[in-house]
Regions:
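Cytochrome P450
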Residues: 1-146
Length: 146
Protein backbone atom coordinates (compact mmCIF):
# COMPACT_ATOMS: atom_id res chain seq x y z
CA UNK A 1 0.00 0.00 0.00
CA UNK A 2 2.93 2.31 0.68
CA UNK A 3 4.56 1.30 -2.63
CA UNK A 4 1.86 1.06 -5.31
CA UNK A 5 4.52 1.11 -8.04
CA UNK A 6 5.97 -2.10 -6.60
CA UNK A 7 2.53 -3.72 -6.50
CA UNK A 8 2.04 -2.84 -10.17
CA UNK A 9 5.43 -4.38 -11.02
CA UNK A 10 4.36 -7.64 -9.35
CA UNK A 11 1.01 -7.69 -11.10
CA UNK A 12 2.65 -7.01 -14.47
CA UNK A 13 5.47 -9.53 -13.91
CA UNK A 14 4.58 -12.36 -11.48
CA UNK A 15 8.06 -13.85 -12.02
CA UNK A 16 9.20 -11.16 -9.53
CA UNK A 17 7.21 -12.77 -6.69
CA UNK A 18 10.18 -14.78 -5.30
CA UNK A 19 12.28 -11.57 -5.22
CA UNK A 20 9.36 -9.74 -3.62
CA UNK A 21 9.08 -12.37 -0.89
CA UNK A 22 12.75 -11.88 0.00
CA UNK A 23 12.38 -8.09 -0.04
CA UNK A 24 9.29 -8.26 2.20
CA UNK A 25 11.23 -10.45 4.63
CA UNK A 26 14.15 -7.99 4.60
CA UNK A 27 11.92 -4.94 4.91
CA UNK A 28 9.51 -6.24 7.57
CA UNK A 29 11.98 -8.29 9.64
CA UNK A 30 9.68 -10.05 12.14
CA UNK A 31 12.29 -10.88 14.80
CA UNK A 32 14.18 -7.76 15.82
CA UNK A 33 17.15 -9.29 17.61
CA UNK A 34 18.67 -12.34 19.25
CA UNK A 35 21.16 -12.62 22.08
CA UNK A 36 23.99 -15.09 21.83
CA UNK A 37 27.06 -16.07 23.84
CA UNK A 38 30.42 -15.99 22.06
CA UNK A 39 31.99 -19.45 22.12
CA UNK A 40 35.48 -18.23 21.23
CA UNK A 41 37.53 -15.06 21.08
CA UNK A 42 37.00 -13.12 17.87
CA UNK A 43 37.53 -9.65 16.48
CA UNK A 44 34.72 -8.14 14.43
CA UNK A 45 35.31 -4.83 12.64
CA UNK A 46 37.97 -3.89 15.17
CA UNK A 47 35.89 -4.84 18.21
CA UNK A 48 37.26 -7.66 20.39
CA UNK A 49 34.70 -10.16 21.59
CA UNK A 50 35.82 -12.68 24.18
CA UNK A 51 34.51 -16.21 24.69
CA UNK A 52 31.61 -15.97 27.12
CA UNK A 53 30.69 -12.38 26.16
CA UNK A 54 27.01 -11.77 25.50
CA UNK A 55 26.32 -10.29 22.07
CA UNK A 56 23.12 -9.17 20.39
CA UNK A 57 22.43 -9.57 16.70
CA UNK A 58 20.04 -6.85 15.54
CA UNK A 59 18.51 -8.43 12.42
CA UNK A 60 16.46 -5.35 11.64
CA UNK A 61 19.64 -3.24 11.56
CA UNK A 62 21.62 -5.80 9.57
CA UNK A 63 18.86 -5.82 6.96
CA UNK A 64 19.42 -2.07 6.44
CA UNK A 65 23.24 -2.26 6.32
CA UNK A 66 24.41 0.22 3.69
CA UNK A 67 27.59 -1.78 3.08
CA UNK A 68 25.47 -4.78 2.03
CA UNK A 69 22.31 -3.30 0.50
CA UNK A 70 22.41 -0.50 -2.07
CA UNK A 71 19.76 2.08 -1.09
CA UNK A 72 18.69 0.00 1.96
CA UNK A 73 15.77 2.24 2.94
CA UNK A 74 14.02 1.75 -0.40
CA UNK A 75 11.61 -1.16 -0.86
CA UNK A 76 12.45 -2.81 -4.19
CA UNK A 77 10.89 -6.08 -5.40
CA UNK A 78 13.66 -6.32 -8.02
CA UNK A 79 16.44 -6.37 -5.39
CA UNK A 80 18.62 -9.34 -6.28
CA UNK A 81 20.68 -10.69 -4.68
CA UNK A 82 19.06 -10.04 -1.33
CA UNK A 83 21.32 -11.46 1.40
CA UNK A 84 19.04 -10.52 4.32
CA UNK A 85 19.41 -12.20 7.70
CA UNK A 86 15.73 -12.25 8.64
CA UNK A 87 15.91 -15.91 9.64
CA UNK A 88 19.34 -15.64 11.25
CA UNK A 89 22.83 -15.72 9.82
CA UNK A 90 22.76 -19.47 9.15
CA UNK A 91 24.28 -22.39 10.95
CA UNK A 92 22.65 -24.23 13.84
CA UNK A 93 20.48 -21.24 14.81
CA UNK A 94 18.88 -20.73 11.39
CA UNK A 95 15.08 -20.53 11.67
CA UNK A 96 13.42 -23.92 11.16
CA UNK A 97 10.31 -22.22 9.77
CA UNK A 98 12.12 -20.21 7.08
CA UNK A 99 11.07 -22.43 4.17
CA UNK A 100 7.45 -22.53 5.32
CA UNK A 101 7.34 -18.74 5.78
CA UNK A 102 8.70 -18.22 2.27
CA UNK A 103 6.24 -20.74 0.81
CA UNK A 104 3.23 -19.20 2.58
CA UNK A 105 4.17 -15.69 1.46
CA UNK A 106 4.83 -16.77 -2.14
CA UNK A 107 1.51 -18.63 -2.40
CA UNK A 108 -0.35 -15.68 -0.87
CA UNK A 109 0.94 -13.36 -3.59
CA UNK A 110 0.50 -15.90 -6.40
CA UNK A 111 -3.16 -16.29 -5.46
CA UNK A 112 -3.97 -12.72 -4.40
CA UNK A 113 -2.31 -10.59 -7.09
CA UNK A 114 -4.31 -11.88 -10.10
CA UNK A 115 -7.54 -11.15 -8.20
CA UNK A 116 -6.55 -7.76 -6.75
CA UNK A 117 -7.65 -4.52 -8.41
CA UNK A 118 -6.86 -2.27 -5.45
CA UNK A 119 -5.98 -2.23 -1.79
CA UNK A 120 -6.18 0.80 0.48
CA UNK A 121 -6.07 1.45 4.22
CA UNK A 122 -9.37 2.24 5.94
CA UNK A 123 -7.98 3.05 9.36
CA UNK A 124 -4.83 3.25 11.42
CA UNK A 125 -2.37 0.37 11.60
CA UNK A 126 -2.04 -1.07 15.11
CA UNK A 127 1.45 -2.49 15.63
CA UNK A 128 2.45 -5.14 18.13
CA UNK A 129 4.19 -3.68 21.15
CA UNK A 130 7.28 -5.77 21.70
CA UNK A 131 11.02 -5.38 22.06
CA UNK A 132 11.50 -8.77 20.40
CA UNK A 133 8.92 -9.23 17.63
CA UNK A 134 8.01 -6.70 14.93
CA UNK A 135 4.56 -7.09 13.49
CA UNK A 136 1.09 -5.78 12.86
CA UNK A 137 -1.73 -6.54 15.26
CA UNK A 138 -4.54 -4.93 13.25
CA UNK A 139 -4.58 -3.33 9.79
CA UNK A 140 -7.98 -2.48 8.30
CA UNK A 141 -8.00 -2.39 4.50
CA UNK A 142 -10.46 -2.22 1.63
CA UNK A 143 -9.76 -4.61 -1.22
CA UNK A 144 -11.16 -4.18 -4.70
CA UNK A 145 -11.47 -7.38 -6.73
CA UNK A 146 -10.80 -7.75 -10.45
Amino acid sequence: MENPDQLRLLQEDPSLIPNAVEEILRWATPVLHFRRTATRDVELRGQKIRAGDKVVTWYISANRDETIFPDPYRFDVRRNPNPHVTFGPGGPHFCLGAHLARLETRVLFQELLPRLASIEPTGPVERMRSNFVHGIKHMPVRIGAR
